[in-house]
Amino acid sequence: MTNETSDAPAATSRGGRASYGGAASLPRSTPPERGLDPAAVGRFLDAVQAREVELHSLMLVRHGSVVAEGWWAPYEPSGLHLLYSLSKSFTATAVGLAVEERRLSVDDLVTSFFPGRVPSDVHPYVAQLKVRDLLSMASGHHEDTLERVDRHDLVRSFLALPPEEEPGTWFTYNNGATLMLSAIVTKLTGERVLDYLRPRLLEPLGITDAYWQQIPDGDGGDPDLRHLDLGFSGLHLATESIAKFGQLFLSRGVWQGEQLVAEDWVRDASRVQVDNPREPEPDWRQGYGYQFWMGREGYRGDGAFGQFCIVLPDVDTVLALTSATENMQAILDCVWSELYPALQSEDGGTGEEASAELQARLGVLTLPLATGDHNAGIELPWLAASPTTGRQEGTTRIESIEEAADGWRLTLADEHATYAVGCGFQTWARSEVEVWPGARLQVAASGAWSDPTTFTAEVAMVQTPHRLTLTCDTATGSTTAQWNVAPLGPTSPSALAFRLADD
C-alpha cells in the first residue's frame, strides 16, 4: 500500500509544456477543461490503494492533453521504467513500419527470412508459419517457446520447435514469437529494433531517451543478428513516452499532422486477430491483435507487474501507468469502475477548485519510507564479520553501514557484484553505481534502525518495478531480503543494470 506524502514534483499546471529527458511534452490541461470530473481520478487512486496495488506513475491524456499525472517517489517524471511485455507493442510497430516500407508483408513465411537457419526436416506447421501468426501469438505452440530455445542460436532452435496446432488457429502467449519478430526486423534492416524505431517513431514523438536490453551471443553465428533486442521485453521508457505512443495509436497513427504509422496498421494491430477464450482473467480473454490485448473497453499494451498503455478510442483517452503488482486485473477493474464512467461524460465536475485539490494530491505521492530511528545502538561504521564468499544465487546482503549526510552509506553484495549506495533517513537517497564495467544501476534507498541492532533499508531499482527490503541483524551479520515483486529472470539487483553496450 502506498502513502501520499513527499516532495515529488507536482503535476504541471494547465497550458504550456514541460521537457522531461529532453523530450517535448504533451500539452497540459485540467480535467474540467477536458470534460472530466477530477473526483473520478481521486476515486481511482482511492480504489487502487484499497486494493493494495503499488503504482509508480500515472498519466491520463484526455482529448489530446494531459489532465492528470503523478509519480510515487522515488520514481520521477524523467526516469525510464522497464516495460516488460509492453515492449511487444513497440516491436510490432517496428514490423508495421517495415511493412509500410515494403520490406515484408504479414503473409510472408517466417522461414523465408532465414534460409540458412531452417532445419532440413522442418515441421510442416513451421514451414507454413507466417509473420501474422507471430504478431497475433498464433504460432500454434501450446506453450511459450522462450524457455525451449537455444540462447546461443535463437532462430534455428525456434524453427526446430514443432507447433502442436496449425498456425493461425491457436492462441498461446509466446515470448519466443516476439523474439522472432525482433530477429526479422533486424535481419531485414541491418539495425536493432530500437535503432530502427528512433528516426521513424521515437524521434518524431519527441522521445530521445530509451534503452532496450539485448540478447548476448544469441546470433548462432549469423552476423546480421549480433545486435538483437529482446523484442518481447527489455524496453525502458519514461511514462510520458508511453502516453505519447498511446496517443499516436488513438490518433490512428498521426502525430502533429504526420502519418507516422499507417492507419491500416493501427486498425489491424488494435482489433481481434485471434480469439483467446482460455485466458483466466476477463481483460485477457477479449481477443488479441498484433501484440496488443483487447480489453472490455478499448485495447492496450501491457507488461508484467502493471505496466500499461491503455487506449480508449470511444472516450478519446489514453492512460499510461507503471506499477509493481502481481494483480494487474485489479488495476483494470479500478479503471472500469471509477474512471471509465466519468470518461463517458463531458461533465467537468465541480471545477477548478477540485482540479487544484487533485493536482496537490498528485504532487505529494510516495512509496513507503523505512520506519524507525536515525541513531544506531552500535558504533558505526559497522562491518560484517565475514565478507561474502561464494555468493549464492538470488541473495543480497548488507556488508557495511557507515554514517553519511542525510543518512548512511551502505555496501551491498549480491551474487554478481559488490557496490556502495546512499541511503536516506526519512527521505530517498539516489545513487548511480557501476556494478561492473559497462553496467550501471540507478538506486534510491531509505533506511532506519528498527531496534538498536537491526537496520532496515528499502532499496528501489528505480528503472524497474523492483524494490528490495533488506533487514540486517548487525549482531549476527545476517541479512534477509524480500522483493516487492521478484524480477522475471535473475533475482539480484546488479542483473537489472543498464549495460552500456546496449545503448
Language-model features and meaning:
Residues T5-A8, G303-L369:
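Structured C-terminal helix/loop/strand segments within mature extracytoplasmic catalytic/sensor domains
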Residues A40-E76, D316-A320:
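A short, well-structured edge-of-sheet supersecondary motif
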Residues G64, H81-D107, L134, L181-V185, ...:
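Active-site SXXK
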Residues D222-P223, H227, R267-L319:
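Active-site Gly/Thr loop motif
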Residues E352-D503:
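Peripheral terminal and inter-domain segments
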Residues A177-I184, G231-V254, Q307-A324:
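Active-site-proximal alpha-helical segments within enzyme catalytic domains
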Residues L97-L104, L181, T186-L194, L202-A210, ...:
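Bacterial peptidoglycan biogenesis and beta-lactam-recognition machinery
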Residues L82, E101-S139, A160, L188-F232:
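Active-site helix/loop module of the DD-peptidase/beta-lactamase fold
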